[in-house]
Each structure stands twice: as C-alpha cells, then as structure tokens.
Amino acid sequence: MTTVRTRIAPSPTGDPHVGTAYIALFNLCFARQHGGQFILRIEDTDQLRSTRESEQQIFDALRWLGIEWDEGPDVGGPHGPYRQSERGEIYKQYSDELVAKGHAFPCFCSAERLDEVRAQQMANKETPRYDGHCMHLDPAEAQRRIAAGESHVVRMKVPSEGVCVVPDMLRGDVEIPWDRMDMQVLMKADGLPTYFLANVVDDHLMGITHVLRGEEWLPSAPKLIKLYEYFGWEQPALCYMPLLRNPDKSKLSKRKNPTSITFYERMGYLPQAMLNYLGRMGWSMPDEREKFSLNEMIEHFDINRVSLGGPIFDLEKLSWLNGQWLRELPVETFAAEVQKWALNPEYLMKIAPHVQGRVETFSQIAPLAGFFFSGALNLDAKLFEHKKLSPDQVRQLMQLILWKLESLRQWEKERITGCIQAVVEHLELKLRDAMPLMFAAITGQASSVSVLDAMEILGPDLTRFRLRQALELLGGTSKKETKEWEKLLASIA
C-alpha cells in the first residue's frame, strides 16, 4: 500500500502567514490520520524577495504552533535538497526533456513585444495570452540563438480548445476551458523555474501522493495536470482548500487583519488555541465541539468534513477561544506561560538598550515601555490633536503612512523612516509633524523611547495593527476618501 505523503511549500518572502499555517495544519492532519509523512519544502526561486531570515521565521512559527515535519531543509531526508534554489540542474533536465518531446519551446519575445500583444488583445476584448509567436521556430534556429547567448524563456504548449477536467477531492470534477490557459513560462530567463514546473517536478520526485493547497490555485490546475501528462507521471490527488476570509468575506489580507503568525505569538495567544482555531476554519469535529487539541483533530480528521464556504478568520472569536484555553490551564502552567511570553530573553534584549539609559529604578520601566508588552492600547483621542493639522489631515497622513508601511518588505528602522519621510515630503510637511502622531498610535503616550526604534522592535503586523486602531478611533476612512487617498499614495515615491 502506498504511503500517504503530503507537503507544504511556502515562499520565504516575508512574515510567516496564517494561511500557510492553516494549509500546513490540514496537510499534517491528513498525513498523520493515514499513517503517512508530512514534508516541508521551500519555494525560494524568487531570488529578489526570498531570504534565509524569512525561511527561519517559517520554521520557528510552524514549530511554535506545534507543527512538525518529517523531511525538510533543516531536518534533511532522502528526497533533498528541499530548497528549490538548490535544485536548478534538476529543473533544467526536465525542462530540456519537455522541449525535446515537443511539449515546450524556447521563447525569445521581448517584454515590450509581449506588452504590445496583450494591449492589442485587451483592446479587442480578447483574453490576454501568449500568441505563440516563437512556438514554430525551427529548432536549429532556436538552438543557434540560445548558443549565441540570446535571452529566452521556456514555455509549455497548451491546447487551444476543449476543457480540462480537474478532479478535486472536495468539489468532484471541475471543468476548466483550455482557452483560459496561457502558454505558461516554465523556465525564466535567469535559468530558474517558475512555480508550475518546480511544483510538478518536486511533487513527483518527492513522492507526494496528495496535494492540499488553497483554492486560489484551482483556476491554474490544468497547467499542472497537463505537465503530469507530458511527463507520463501519475498525478497526485488534488484538494483545493477554501480560502480564509475577513469578516466582510473578502480574502484575508494584512490591510484588514493581522496575517503574521508572529503577531499572534507576540500578542500572547497560546499556540494550542491558535492551532485549534485554524483547525475550525472550514472543518469541525464529528461531535461539533469547539475546543480540541492537535492530537484530537488528527484522530478524528476526515477531509470530507471540510466545508467549501469561505471560513471567516475573526479576531474576536480567536480571542474567545484563547480565553477558554487560558482558563483551563493549571495555575502553575498559566504562570509559566506568562513568564515565557513576557520575559522572552531575545525580545527583552531588543528592548533593554532603549530603556536602560532612561530609568533610575526597575519600577520605572513599566510606565516607560509597557507598550512593548501590550496588544491593543487604550488610546486617548486628545493625543492626536495637532497644532498644525486638521483632524481630516491627521487621518490622511496616518492612513498614507499605514499604506506605505504595508508595502515595506524589509522591516528596518531606516526603511520605516524612509516610508514616513516619503509621505510627509509629498504632503509638504516635516517629519516632526508626523512623529507626535506616531508616538500616540504606537506607544499610547506623548513621549517614550524612540518611536522608530519601537516600530522596528514591535514588528510590521503589530505596528500596522496599532495604526489601524488609531485610525478607527479617529473615525476611520470613508470609501470616497479611500479612493482619493489611494490615488495620492500611487504618486508617492
């Protein structure tokens, strides 16, 4: 009997996302329930955005939740390497095989030509897709151009008509027309694979039997299915999980909800409660109980109990469930958990240099730096009264800074300062006009340690959470203002 093998394959391009943990949990439960294995693979072919720091954060966040893997970059295994950036020669071998079989072709089209083709197709109300310009190039001519060092990608061929039947474990057979599919790039000009080729090759070579992934990948499933067909490989069973949603039913995003696992760790949620809550996202225990452990979920796990309705990720419900877990802890365990959270040595070492020179006794630390150990703050609207700016201008300035910070990929003091500076200069203001508002939103005080240092230490999700909290206190942003201010944001360098 074939051993069930599932996997999670996150990209190390930012803070570890709750959506990653959600999909990892269901892959883990499915594998364990069937006596199988769960693999962690790192999809780091985006060399510009991928970092080892983000990779380590993924490891740490999943382990904090209690999610462990049988094979992966840090634990090894018989199917390594488990980082896609270390498997380049493997992908090239299989890309060359597809070209040799006539299932793929080198494409030399420039970005300018592709833009022109797509613009013309859109003007004609056609689906934008590659027009096959290089598909019928003479193979000898293509090889001559490659040998001469001409920049190119490798594209897969796809049918131009008919439908692809996608067998989904949750939805049954899903029919997707082939004319919606583009001739997908498989190998980029830099010699690295795209998601589609790497995904299929790795899943096959690593013996993955079941793929549980987010439903946002369902529309592109025909490309993956066609690649399995081209290689002559058995396709793993496919299961497209419902996406996590905000309370307003929109896709979970950092604009409306903190999405980083590290945010919830820093806020003082128990990992057991967080995992329990993620387990209730679109799934329920047979007896409908709300509180259950990972082992209990594995014992009773049945993929057919997954509901296709978009599960709502609601902070209030998560907090309620966390409270249930906290209240059932023995007092000694509760005290130990508080100590582990509040007196985290690594976190304290980040804070200590900014506090040590400003206090004369330890008792002065809490009033000065207590905000480092809080989640939501009790804000006073009077702190946002500005000598120079009207209330509307205050909201606009803070909203633009929040949006600008949302686009920041590397959370460092200099880059945070640069974001704020860019906004204030565009509004013809000074940095000193914004800093009192930042102090108020981030620390809940008129003054404290350097607010820029505080923002770096608190991290992106908690910083943005507090800015959103302050904006809500000041009345929020109307739909009309959002439209107008987003246009303004686009013009800020």
UniProtKB/Swiss-Prot annotation:
Q: At which positions is motif 'KMSKS' region?
A: 251-255
- What is the designated name of this protein? Glutamate--tRNA ligase
Residue numbers of motif 'HIGH' region? 10-20
UniProt-listed Pfam families:
Anticodon_2, tRNA-synt_1c
Q: Which Cys-Cys disulphide bridges does the record give?
A: none
Q: Does the keyword Cytoplasm apply?
A: yes
Binding-site residues, ATP: 254
One GO cellular component term: cytosol
- Note on how the cofactor is bound: Binds 1 zinc ion per subunit.
EC id: 6.1.1.17
Record SUPFAM superfamilies: An anticodon-binding domain of class I aminoacyl-tRNA synthetases (SSF48163), Nucleotidylyl transferase (SSF52374)
In the UniProt record, the gene name given for this protein reads gltX
- Which family does the entry's similarity section mention? Belongs to the class-I aminoacyl-tRNA synthetase family. Glutamate--tRNA ligase type 1 subfamily.
Q: From what superkingdom does this record's organism come?
A: Bacteria
Q: What class of enzyme is it?
A: ligase
Q: What PANTHER family is this protein classified in?
A: GLUTAMATE--TRNA LIGASE, GLUTAMATE--TRNA LIGASE, MITOCHONDRIAL-RELATED
Cofactor(s) of this protein: Zn(2+)
Q: Where in the cell is it found?
A: Cytoplasm
Q: What molecular functions are annotated in GO for this chain?
A: ATP binding; glutamate-tRNA ligase activity; tRNA binding; zinc ion binding
